[in-house]
A protein has these predicted regions:
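Secreted, luminal/periplasmic, and some membrane-associated catalytic domains
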Residues: 1-128, 133-134
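Residue-level signal for beta-strand positions within conserved beta-sheet cores that form or flank
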Residues: 2, 148, 190
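Short, hydrophobic alpha-helical segments
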Residues: 7, 178, 182-186
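Substrate-binding rim/cap in mid-to-C-terminal beta-strand-loop elements of soluble/periplasmic
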Residues: 29-66, 135-176, 180-181
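Composition- and surface-driven signal marking solvent-exposed, interaction-prone regions
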Residues: 122-123, 166-168, 190-191
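C-terminal beta-strand edge segments of enzyme domains
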Residues: 184-199
Length: 199
């Protein structure tokens, strides 16, 4: 056991949720996607959920169409202005990409506290208890929010006893640290080794 290291980590945290926002319903009502036989068949704009956030994509055939961009933004700004809908913030493609999100999205949405997004189109909102998904908590919210962190702990061989890291670390720092612990050279990585934890 003297050559054993135990690592505990989480890749994300959970937030309590009780309301669901279906952005595709509003896009459908605005004529930005079409439904046939109960299924989305074509789209100019489409919302793809990430639980606590949501990507908005424009179809490649219209992604540079100023009118489609304007209509899509208007739908989203209208939803954001509603007390009874779950959009907290709308991010541009550049803002999303700078956080490491999909640079191919047109926009990205952040959910209000207690809300999350799903892809369905049949209704605009629902109480979580009325959804088949049955989620009481979910992840996918934007990083940096208060009380939205996870944990990382190591103990054992090659770990400094009693070491505490008081700075914020990212998942990619955990990966770089685990690679260093295993003496694996990952080359150039996004993360930095958390040296204060290692002997």
């Amino acid at each position: 056991m003297e050559s054993t290291t135990v690592v505990l980590l989480g890749d994300h945290y959970q937030k309590d949720v009780d309301k669901v926002a279906f952005v595709n319903h509003a896009l459908w009502k605005a004529g930005l996607l079409t439904v046939r036989n109960g299924r989305i068949k074509s789209w100019k704009a489409y919302a793809k959920n990430c639980d606590g956030s949501c990507y908005i994509y424009l179809h490649p055939s219209v992604e540079n169409n100023a009118e489609v961009q304007k209509r899509t933004r208007k739908v989203l700004e209208t939803l954001k202005g509603r007390e009874d809908f779950g959009i907290e913030r709308i991010l541009t493609r550049e803002e999303a990409a700078n956080m490491g999100a999909d640079e191919n999205c047109f926009l990205m949405l952040e959910a209000k506290e207690g809300w999350f997004f799903l892809d369905e189109w049949e209704q605009l909102t629902a109480a979580e208890k009325d959804c088949a998904h049955g989620m009481k908590g979910t992840h996918g919210y934007l990083p940096g929010e208060t009380d939205y962190q996870t944990f990382f702990a190591m103990s054992g061989c090659s770990i400094r006893a009693g070491a505490r890291v008081e700075k914020n670390i990212a998942l990619w720092d955990e990966g770089a640290t685990l690679a260093a612990l295993l003496e694996i050279d990952l080359g150039k990585t996004d993360g930095s080794v958390i040296r204060e934890m290692l002997q």
